[in-house]
Regions:
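Short, charged N-terminal beta->alpha structural module
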Residues: 1-37, 166-173
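A short, charged/proline- and glycine-enriched loop
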Residues: 1-3, 8-9, 50, 144-153
């Protein structure tokens, strides 16, 4: 089965297991042995090039509103799927035009991949499209275990409502004052 993966990321091709920045989206491409293409390259790809496409739509979708993304995606892939981005109703913080565009895009999918059971029920209920879980993948081949111990806490996510950074910080304070917070996402 030939799988194409599509996102706003600027790289093309397969992802090797020794990739230096094996984020979840990159790990999915690697684990599925998929070829990745950025959105602007869709128009250059052959008809029915892939049996299945997996797409991650960006949080900021305004630039896509006037691009024939759905038409190009369906031309290139025999089956089209989308992976939800962020928490289940994040998209409802967008402009009305973006919300309608996003919802209409979802309803044209053969399958919607979700993060968890709650999101699965939500997306199936609101779109009546088949939903399945696509769990987080960690490829740990290049992770070197620490040989020293430490007492600090690392918290992830940004300090915005969407990621609960402040909540994580409060929990970490219960454990230690030595806290490291990395910036990710938006």
């Amino acid at each position: 089965m030939k799988i194409g993966f599509f996102s706003e990321a600027g790289y093309e091709g397969k992802v090797e297991r020794n990739h230096p920045n094996m984020r979840t989206d990159v790990a999915w491409v690697c684990a599925l042995d998929a070829n990745h293409h950025p959105f602007p390259k869709l128009s250059t790809l052959s008809d029915d090039m892939y049996d299945v496409g997996v797409m991650i739509l960006p949080k900021k979708r305004k630039p896509l509103l006037n691009y024939p993304l759905l038409e190009q995606y369906k031309r290139v892939c025999k089956k089209v799927t989308v992976m939800q981005e962020s928490y289940y109703n994040y998209w409802q913080d967008s402009s009305i035009a973006e919300q309608i565009w996003y919802f209409n895009f979802l309803t044209e999918m053969d399958l919607i991949f979700c993060h968890n059971d709650v999101d699965l029920k939500y997306y199936n209920g609101i779109t009546n499209v088949r939903t399945e879980l696509l769990p987080t993948v960690m490829i740990t081949d290049n992770i070197v275990p620490r040989n020293e111990s430490g007492d600090g806490v690392i918290i992830g996510g940004n300090w915005v409502r969407d990621y609960g950074g402040f909540d994580s910080y409060q929990v970490a304070l219960e454990i230690t004052d030595d806290i490291t917070s990395i910036t990710t996402g938006r």
